[in-house]
């Protein structure tokens, strides 16, 4: 079940006059939660190994769609996540990017994680 809010589309098209998925719109939304969110922008294959993060309770991955990138993202997420943390991955079962599903399935199996598919799109991984 997917809910589409027509008021959201009207608001962004005629009042805000911006794409609701643009970087500006997303940053405006996330600023409401700035005490709890840290946005890190860049190529995860390069920046994740440079970060010093720990005890992150929730990680949302919406990144590259190739196998090696997803493996890298999950490898570092495991290092950063707290005990009983949750990793949510977007685009789990894309027909044109089978490496995403393969990397996630391998990670879940290798790390004995709980797995839940949400809305046929998101992979919820509990460590």
Task: List each model region and its residues.
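S-adenosylmethionine/decaboxylated-SAM
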Residues: 1-127
């Amino acid at each position: 079940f997917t809910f589409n809010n027509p008021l959201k589309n009207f608001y962004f098209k005629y009042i805000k006059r911006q794409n609701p998925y643009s970087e500006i719109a997303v940053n405006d939304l996330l600023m409401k939660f700035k005490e709890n969110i840290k946005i890190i922008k860049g190529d995860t294959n390069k920046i994740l190994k440079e970060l010093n993060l720990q005890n992150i309770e929730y990680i949302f991955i919406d990144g590259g769609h190739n196998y090696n990138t997803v493996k890298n993202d999950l490898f570092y997420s495991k290092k950063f996540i707290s005990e009983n943390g949750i990793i949510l991955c977007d685009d789990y079962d894309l027909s044109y990017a089978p490496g995403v599903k393969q990397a996630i399935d391998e990670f879940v199996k290798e790390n004995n994680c709980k797995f839940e598919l949400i809305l046929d799109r998101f992979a919820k991984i509990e460590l």
